[in-house]
Amino acid sequence: MQCLFLEERIKKEGCVVLFAEAFRPSFANIQGFLTTIAEPVSRLSLMHEYRMTYFSLGAAASASISVSEVIQFLDDHVYFFRDKCFASYRESVCAFAEMYMSRCNLARVVIDESRTLLECKDIVTAKTLLKDRVVRSLCCQPKETVGEDACPHFLLKSRAAARVVAERCVLLGYPLQQQYEYEKDTSIRNVNIALKSQTRPRPYQIAAVDAAASDGALRSGCIVLPCGSGKTLVGIMLLCKVKKPTLILCAGGVSVEQWRNQILEFASVCAPANNEEGDPSNSTTGEKVRTAAVGAARISCLTGKQKDEITDETDIVLTTYSMLVTAHKAQARCQVEGFEMNADGRGRNPRRANPKERLFQPYGLLIMDEVHMMPADAYKDSLGFINAKGVVGLTATYVREDSKIRDLFHLVGPKLFDISWERLASSGYLAHVTCIEVLTPLARRFSLEYLERSSELTSPQHGTPLLVMLAAANPNKMLCVMEIVKRHVAESSKILVFCDHIMLLKEYSKLLGAPVVCGDTPHRERLMIFSDFQSTSKVNVVCLSRVGDVSVNLPSANVVVQVSSHGGSRRQEAQRLGRILRPKEKASNGKPTDAWFYTVISTDTVEMSYAAHRTAFLVDQGYTCSVTEFNPDGAPEAAVEGVDDTAPGDVVSIRQAKLRGTFKKQELKCSVASPTAQGSVNPRSLDYQEKLLCRVVASWELDYQNATSQQNEPGVANDTATGLIDKKMKRARDETAEDIKREWNSGAQTTQPRGDFCRLPLQRLVGANDDVVYHES
């Protein structure tokens, strides 16, 4: 049955747009194939939008889907596609699919023990690639093809050259396929790892693993699953299926710890079945042989605070992206100094062995958690030095604010599996989330300062770091957050408060009496806070910085309050929403407990445009978002003292219904006339507002001085300039709000801010920059 509409945009945008009627019964039968050949753009409740692009067709070809199957699918399910009046459109779409899919999988990278080969399916493809100057320069001498029979191939200079060749081949229109036949590989030892009998994978997790590994072969690529859907278990299932030494890259130290714990929870890691390591029968001298390591002893973790030794018995290595870059730089530095980094630490210059040196030993499998981080310039250069035959990336946010997300096609591989939040939520695997934008007016003093700073801008940009911080520090936001937290604490909710500015994060900690978790929080203290939050009622609210965006496993959390964010980053929005997507315990009437996601926005500020960009992304993913206004000066609402005994249902359901009714109103008011906070924080106090404003402006001025001092004036010595800056910074710390206002008012009349600073693009100042990764090593 037909349920698709097609729009041809090949000449304008280089794609074919497909609109799907999601309400049709036949749509469920074709959604899997449609997601394979086209990239999902918008998934509303009734209509979905997909785009057939060069990359999606390449992914389809790598999944062994032919051009004829794609055309037959369009003939069967697109309205009017075979009508004579649309014959020209059909020919254009068929030619588009034929042109790209016919070139896919014509070449692949093959890695054996000592060589890196580029293998082609025919001699014509091999000769075409060798004509390119870049590809030819990366080949060993001689550059002629070897074995001009069924599979001609030629040698590459190094493993790192394979990444450059892969990128170049994509530009030439010959995307490479990387396939690893792990069952036939004898150059890398097998590991004895298997899922425990009590582990019960979900159907979509099994489908994701089968999409990557089947029939003894592993296809390199990316698996996209929503936050909270069990990506870590998918990675563990791949470990158990491939059964080869594996390197796992994580976002940070907490993520490494969580991966290690879940591997030990869901899988059994044992010594080789034939007991090659430590079998007494293998000893001919009668000496006592050490027993082979099992379990956690076969897992090594390398982070900034934990550096386990990587031995011959190590089956799994867990490390961070930052540690990978550090090891890569150390290896390059040692090579420049004139000796190679051997595993035993011996070279022409004797030195102590470093555990990081063995990160680049041969692996059968490389798993990259949060793979959307890999296209960053700081990381992708190090990827080429990892000697792994199969690569799989895991992510919940296959999106970046720049165009680098496309680089994953040649860095890792095509998208292998993708499933929407809506499908998992309807099946009960994820929680139903209520997304609410709360519009909060700026406090009077902050509003005047915001208008004054806005008028001083000399470039046509929409904001500066100071404007963003003024909007985030809005005291009325504090009142709003207090009100939201108060209502949910009364329902025994677990609440996460996100704020990107550390100074403001500490203010919210004082305001709510909640612990802070940021980059400076010690690892042990962080784990204790998360443990108390997860399993006790001692901690119900935690204030988090950007370190909580990824790899924080808190299934009990069901409320997120977002005070400030990283510009319009859609990735960050989805990741923070993912903290509460895990399914919650049901009430006694069988209904699931709701999850709540609040974004508190200062009206008439730059936050409005950023929030619109992020919310549009959530709507495209199928979430329902509503808007309410917070009135800090409105008449207080009557407090709810108890539960209506006449209402049907249990206490939890009634309270959830009352919360939904409260936030469906167009205006949210304080439940008490003058809410009081713990400690010295009182957002209604004019004295507190003045001090907070002073600190915000002074903090920005220090950042301004640091930014402008990087370019010294001509003729001024570095040490002199540094001394002047130190004096200015010391003076800025001692200034009051009146001093700062006087200085800026006088400066605005005589001179304008430095042109080079003002001409910085908005993307670099306050926009979302996905090359900046906020986590600890």
Curated annotation (Swiss-Prot):
Disulfide bonds: none annotated. One of its GO terms (biological process) is DNA-templated transcription. The lineage of its organism: Eukaryota, Discoba, Euglenozoa, Kinetoplastea, Metakinetoplastina. This is DNA repair helicase/translocase XPB-R. Keywords: ATP-binding, DNA damage, DNA repair, Helicase, Hydrolase, Isomerase, Nucleotide-binding. ATP binds at residues 225-232. PANTHER family: GENERAL TRANSCRIPTION AND DNA REPAIR FACTOR IIH HELICASE SUBUNIT XPB, RAD25/XP-B DNA REPAIR HELICASE. Residues 484-631 form the Helicase C-terminal domain.
